UniProtKB/Swiss-Prot annotation:
One of its GO terms (biological process) is plant-type cell wall modification. This is Beta-galactosidase. GO terms for molecular function: beta-galactosidase activity; carbohydrate binding. Involved in cell wall degradation. Degrades polysaccharides containing beta-(1-->4)-linked galactans, acting as an exo-(1-->4)-beta-D-galactanase. The active site is at residues 180, 249.
Length: 835
């Protein structure tokens, strides 16, 4: 009897756990999961921007970094490339991705949208949607709403069928409908508001059992939670008092565009922004991005968004830790979680500590107390009095006190190591074969129309390329044939790039930019008496991903097209007979694939084309040993696309040099996307990620299509590895270890901080490049001695670190031969070479 009673009680307990407790709700303090308010740290990882083989490692590293939730968009055009034909495999296996997150013990925030933006091609919309009769995007339009509801319902039903919502025992605790709709609604007016209310009701009626959010939109209807996106969101307040303060996109930097420099965001400012949000009552923060990844294939939007979507995220494009950002934020998350009991219990009280300083204190009835001491001054340290103690606050920083007494973390004091990454060649170059693609002609698979057609309407985005071809008849009596003053061809295009061929010869190239994709070709061209063939190769570089009325956007040669300098004056070519051909011959033959590559006759050796436009190159190589991330150095090439074993690494365009000013960037002060830049005057993207899972042990096919003309012999396969590691630690820097000792009762006096150095597995510290205890200056990779320097700064590191994978050295004067300058705030800067 006792056995069966125990079994019955166990069954009832299981039912209670699965049915009674599994719930997600919210109040004004936080998201409530299974009855418990939670401070949630989230990170964006977009499943198609990495490979399934990378997912477990990325998610594990996010978890180790203190992340509780993985956030992702759902990419409609990846899942329904043709109307009614769905795809959920390989990089688009959404269910598998969510289950990998679940296996790691993390939650999921599923941003169904289905508009994504995300610098993704066409904002995530499938191009076929543009051609649904009567459609108008993201407004009170029946054809659009019907398509949106159908896809959203399909995704929700898939999640339910796999039991992936938290209320079913799964990891999904939040969903999002629409995306950043506030600016759109403001522009559209009443139709936008009606659509927004419809979208909210449609989503709630799907019955997911978890809350829905709408981001960057102040007037979302109940019960939807409105949330904030931006570089800072401490100012944000939800539109109802019963909703939690949530930050769905804390931008870790910004995207890279072809022709632009590479943005980055200092770890200190990122931590400051997050701490500032938490101290003002925020309880959910998502890093956009935590791992940015790669825009493989033709998935980048913009137009002109680069193939790399690195975003200066805590995990870099290749999946490696970006230090110190990953480590500094990990320490921040640990400090915040120590404060969680107080943070979720009460609203803060605010006390001024000076003109630019304040304290925000969370003190619960149960006795939990946490304090955030902030110094908003961008230029000066502050010494503040709080709770009968004094605290030193660096400029533009926040100190976190989980017991309202002891500082465990300051946003401007980085305890994590920095790492300098390097790209090491793993091959001496490749043995190439080439195939030259001629300018298209009327004899090719073409169709004819009088006048100029919009590009995407013709290509339906199956290719970046559309040929516009026409004939120009030149009378033998034309004056320019004798004078040598060539006639002037002018072509107006909606974008994004254009190659002009005259009688099969390249006459010029023009291209736009993200800010101004439209372009004009205007140049003299060499014509002969008789019939001349004009071939315009119009190129799309990703479809726009943001803005109103997607159905109206266009690309390609829309005209006018004219020829000046003839006896007749100007000849309008716009309404001539034009021949059209979608794509390239090499695309039609699938030259990039293992099966299609043998379909043409390639040349090799001295006959390989170099610096020739419209050239295809191929080679084979064996996979290198090891497990370091791999990339192709494409710096000697112009523009085109790259494939490995038939899989596209993305568009390459290293010849588009970046503009902008890359001046020294300080972490203090307001950050925006133009503040901190690198790569000025260089190619926007040199390195192109090669996923190891795409490689065979031997015989890998590498194919490059080059539009402009480059030198393929400069292409090299490289591995990405740590070149050196650094520590930059102040004396008496706050550290969590002292707090842990205090809580354990083993605290007698605070311990000095330590410099921790760690190379990658398989590497060892081979030498110490720099070490100085005193007042060193500079940053990792470029340290210099200051006016104060302990002469034995190197000794402890040579003794304790050289020959080891990792080491720790306490930052205390005794380790460096004594105090080199008393009554001066000192720090230790060290750089160790990994090999």
């Amino acid at each position: 009897m006792g056995f069966w009673m125990a079994m019955l009680l166990m069954l009832l307990l299981c039912l209670w756990v699965s049915c009674g407790i599994a719930s997600v709700s919210y109040d004004h303090k936080a998201i409530i999961v299974n009855g418990q308010r939670k401070i949630l740290i989230s990170g964006s990882i977009h499943y198609p921007r990495s490979t399934p083989e990378m997912w477990p490692d990325l998610i594990q590293k996010a978890k180790e970094g203190g992340v509780d939730v993985i956030q992702t968009y759902v990419f409609w055009n990846g899942h329904e490339p043709e109307e009614g034909k769905y795809y959920f495999e390989e990089r688009y296996d959404l269910v598998k991705f969510i289950k990998v997150v679940q296996e790691a013990g993390l939650y999921v925030h599923l941003r169904i949208g289905p508009y994504a933006c995300a610098e993704w091609n066409f904002g995530g919309f499938p191009v076929w949607l543009k051609y649904v009769p009567g459609i108008s995007f993201r407004t009170n339009n029946e054809p659009f709403k019907a398509a949106m509801q159908k896809f959203t319902t399909k995704i929700v039903d898939m999640m339910k069928a796999e039991k992936l919502y938290e209320t079913q025992g799964g990891p999904i605790i939040l969903s999002q409908i629409e995306n950043e709709y506030g600016p759109m609604e403001w522009e559209l007016g009443e139709p936008g508001k009606v659509y927004s209310e419809w979208a909210a009701k449609m989503a709630v009626d799907l019955g997911t059992g978890v809350p829905w959010i709408m981001c960057k939109q102040d007037d979302v209807p109940d019960p939807i939670i409105n949330t904030c996106n931006g570089f800072y969101c401490d100012y944000f307040t939800p539109n109802k008092a019963n909703k939690p303060k949530m930050w769905t996109e804390a931008w870790t930097a910004w995207f890279t565009e072809f022709g632009g420099p590479v943005p980055y965001r200092p770890a200190e400012d990122m931590a400051f922004a997050v701490a500032r949000f938490i101290q003002t009552g925020g309880s959910f923060i998502n890093y956009y991005m935590y791992h940015g990844g790669t825009n493989f294939g033709r998935t980048s939007g913009g137009p002109f968004i680069a193939t790399s979507y690195d975003y200066d995220a805590p995990l870099d494009e290749f999946g490696s830790l970006r230090q110190p950002k990953w480590g500094h934020l990990k320490d921040l998350h640990r400090a915040i979680k120590l404060c969680e009991p107080a943070l979720v219990s009460v609203d803060p009280t605010v006390t001024s500590l000076g003109n630019y300083q304040e304290a925000r204190v969370f003190k619960s009835e149960s006795g939990a107390c946490a304090a955030f001491l902030a110094n908003y001054n961008q230029h000066s340290f502050a010494k503040v009095a709080f709770g009968n103690m004094h605290y030193n606050l660096p400029p533009w920083s926040i100190s976190i006190l989980p017991d309202c007494k002891n500082t465990v973390y300051n946003t401007a004091r980085v305890g994590a190591q920095s790492a300098q990454m390097k790209m090491t060649p793993v091959s001496r170059g490749f043995s190439w074969e080439s195939f030259n693609e001629d300018a298209a002609s009327h004899e090719d698979d073409t169709f004819t129309v009088v006048g100029l057609l919009e590009q995407i309407n013709i290509t339906r985005d199956v290719s970046d390329y559309l040929w516009y071809m026409t004939d120009i008849e030149i009378d033998p009596t034309e004056g320019f044939l004798n004078s040598g003053n060539w006639p002037w061809l002018t072509v107006f295009s909606a974008g994004h790039a254009l190659h002009v061929f005259v009688n099969g010869q390249l006459a010029g190239t023009v291209y736009g930019s993200l800010e101004n994709p439209k372009l004009t070709f205007s140049n003299g061209i060499n014509l002969r008496a008789g019939v001349n063939k004009i071939s315009l190769l119009s190129i799309a570089v990703g479809l726009p991903n943001v803005g109103p009325h997607f159905e109206t956007w266009n690309a390609g040669v829309l005209g006018p097209v004219s020829l000046n300098g003839l006896n007749e004056g100007t000849r309008d070519l716009t309404w001539q007979k034009w021949f059209y051909k979608v794509g390239l011959k090499g695309e039609a033959l699938s030259l990039h694939s293992l099966s299609g590559s043998p379909s043409v006759e390639w040349v090799e050796g001295s006959l390989v084309a170099q610096k020739q436009p419209l050239s295809w190159y191929k080679t084979t190589f064996n996979a290198p040993d090891g497990n370091e991330p791999l990339a192709l150095d494409m710096n000697t090439m112009g523009k085109g696309q790259v494939w490995i074993n038939g899989q596209s690494l993305g568009r390459h365009w290293p010849a588009y040099k970046s503009s902008g000013s890359c001046s020294v960037c300080n972490y203090t002060g307001w950050f925006d996307e133009k503040k901190c830049l690198t790569n000025c005057g260089e190619g926007s993207q040199r390195w192109y990620h090669v996923p190891r899972s795409w490689l065979y042990p031997t015989g890998n096919l590498l194919v490059v299509f080059e539009e402009w003309g480059g030198d393929p012999y400069g292409i090299t396969l490289v591995k990405r590895e740590i070149g050196s590691v650094c520590a930059d630690i102040y004396e008496w820097q706050p550290q969590l270890l002292n707090w842990q000792r205090l809580v354990s009762g083993k605290f007698d006096r605070p311990l000095r901080p330590k410099a921790h150095l760690k190379c990658a597995p398989g590497q060892k510290i081979s030498s110490i490049k720099f070490a100085s205890f005193g007042t060193p200056e500079g940053v990792c990779g470029n340290f210099q001695q200051g006016s104060c320097h302990a002469p034995r700064s190197y000794d402890a590191f040579k003794k304790n670190c050289v020959g080891k994978e990792s080491c720790s050295v306490q930052v205390t004067p005794e380790n460096f031969g004594g105090d080199p300058c008393r009554n001066v705030l000192k720090k230790l800067s060290v750089e160790a070479i990994c090999s």
